[in-house]
């Protein structure tokens, strides 16, 4: 027959202190809400140091270590947008002459178009947007997006502008320096479409 013993002595006070439920800490709850709010305001880009600085400016005493612990408790992580770098081409592009000479006062539509390419972070990678503007209307007349900033992107935007404006003849297209366009491909396109000089 088994014999069971139960120890009838008081438990260690350290054991009791460790296992008792914690009292809700009002100050910590306020700081947690501040961390959550500030992380949201920064669209997830602020880290512990930035959050601590912003909270201190708001009047809440917080160091970066406390901010880091609160971020960890809330499951928040700083996500930084990567910096953009154009890849270097293998060869130098031919300089495109500037026929416009900063004469932006255009008297009629479809006389002068200008274009540029910019980059946009899409959440996973960089996308490139090429835009063609009519200098008379001061509005976009053609655009195109791509994941690679090559001459095809600029050509698509130029084709869209040419189609939407009724295939005009004699239009001068001036590319801003950031536009990635190769002289051979743009020249042949302008020759085919009659869009004028590049």
Curated annotation (Swiss-Prot):
Residues 105-198 form the Integrase catalytic domain. Gene3D superfamilies: Ribonuclease H-like superfamily/Ribonuclease H. SUPFAM superfamilies: Ribonuclease H-like (SSF53098). The keyword rRNA processing does not apply. Disulfide bonds: none annotated. Involved in the transposition of the insertion sequence IS911B. This is Putative transposase InsO for insertion sequence element IS911B. The lineage of its organism: Bacteria, Pseudomonadati, Pseudomonadota, Gammaproteobacteria, Enterobacterales. The gene is insO2.
């Amino acid at each position: 027959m088994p014999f069971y013993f139960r120890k009838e002595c008081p438990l260690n006070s350290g054991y009791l202190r460790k296992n008792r439920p914690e009292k809700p800490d009002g100050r910590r709850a306020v700081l947690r809400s501040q961390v959550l709010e500030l992380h949201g305001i920064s669209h997830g880009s602020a880290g512990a140091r930035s959050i601590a600085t912003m909270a201190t400016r708001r009047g809440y005493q917080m160091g970066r270590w406390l901010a880091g612990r609160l971020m960890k408790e809330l499951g928040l992580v700083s996500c930084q947008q990567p910096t953009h770098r154009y890849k270097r081409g293998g060869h130098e592009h031919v300089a495109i002459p500037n026929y416009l000479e900063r004469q932006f006062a255009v008297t009629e539509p479809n006389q002068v178009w200008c274009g540029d390419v910019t980059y946009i972070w899409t959440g996973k990678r960089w996308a490139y947007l090429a835009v063609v503007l009519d200098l008379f209307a001061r509005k976009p007349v053609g655009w195109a997006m791509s994941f690679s900033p090559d001459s095809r992107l600029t050509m698509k935007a130029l084709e869209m502008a040419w189609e939407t404006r009724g295939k005009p003849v004699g239009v001068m297209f001036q590319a801003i320096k950031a536009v990635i366009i190769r002289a051979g491909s743009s020249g042949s396109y302008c020759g085919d479409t009659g869009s004028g000089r590049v």
